[in-house]
Amino acid sequence: MTKTKEEKKIEILKGQIQKGKGVDIGTMFVKCAYKEGNEIVFRSQRNSFFEVEHSDFTKKILDNSKVKYIIKEDKLYVVGDEALEFANMFNKETRRPLSRGVISPTEKEALPMIELLIKSVVDEPTYKGEIVYFSVPGEPLDAEFNILYHIKMIEGFLKTLGYTPKSINEGHAIILSELAEEDFTGIGLSFGGGMVNVCLSFLSVPVFKFSVTKAGDWIDQQVAMAVDETASRVSAIKESSLDLSKEGTLSKIESALSIYYNHLIEYVIENIKQEFTKTRRLPRIAKPISIILSGGTSLPTGFSNRFRQILERLKLPIPVGSVRMASQPLRSVAKGALVAASADESKK
């Protein structure tokens, strides 16, 4: 029996990963996934930088400590994980080269910073022209900014390193990472810092994909305003101790976080419902589909249960089976991008 084009594509995607790399370029972190032997290896750097006093002595100390930095116009910037350490030391905030999932238009130092961060996690290609897939956000439904510029700049950085770069939607990457056993059919949701990315896929082919700019940073800012706290403190509590399954006595910040998490989940589900209404020629999906949740904003205890409860109330226009967290919520985008890169490499 002759196999269809879709069946052949799924077989390739399920094949053993050999060459290629996957890169998740997020607002908070840059991550890379690649294969070493039979293991998938992940590298990560915080997507941030911090200006420190520029002197020969400082430069020597940083060199000896192997701290990543850039010197630009007589200014010295520490980049990556160490930037946060320096910021905490001086009780100041780091700066980010990305805003809402794309290269920041207001941060004039963004380009050299993101280039160095990408180079530090991706490293040299195994051979010239090795395929690397990098994640990109879907077109935002609630904002206007230039995704094309972002894509072309990242492509340029990776080409300079010797790669053949290709882009993949962030939500689609989650599906490739998590839904091999379901023939890559389902909904992938990436709850990041700057955006929530959504993709509905049928037999590995995206049906619709989009993003919204209400996400983790938005929650921090709204809660901070509501309770008169700093966004940094709200974020620290959200990341370290928030439990969305907790009932009874909640602190003021916990109560506000719970309210805004509800609002975010409702907002995402309502936008998914609208996309179903707007999309023509939806495929006939016979079985209930899975929804995969991932990203740093999805990490608090009880998030998946909270999502399920709200979904039961709001209901999608197609049957939903499993609603579950990705196996590695912070790594699934990079892993999915690696699956795509490896599938392309196997066709060579």
Task: Describe each region flagged by the PLM.
Residues 1-188, 203-212, 216, 221-290, ...:
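Nucleotide/phosphate-binding catalytic cleft detector across ATP-hydrolyzing
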Residues 197-199:
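A structural feature that tracks compact, well-ordered secondary-structure segments
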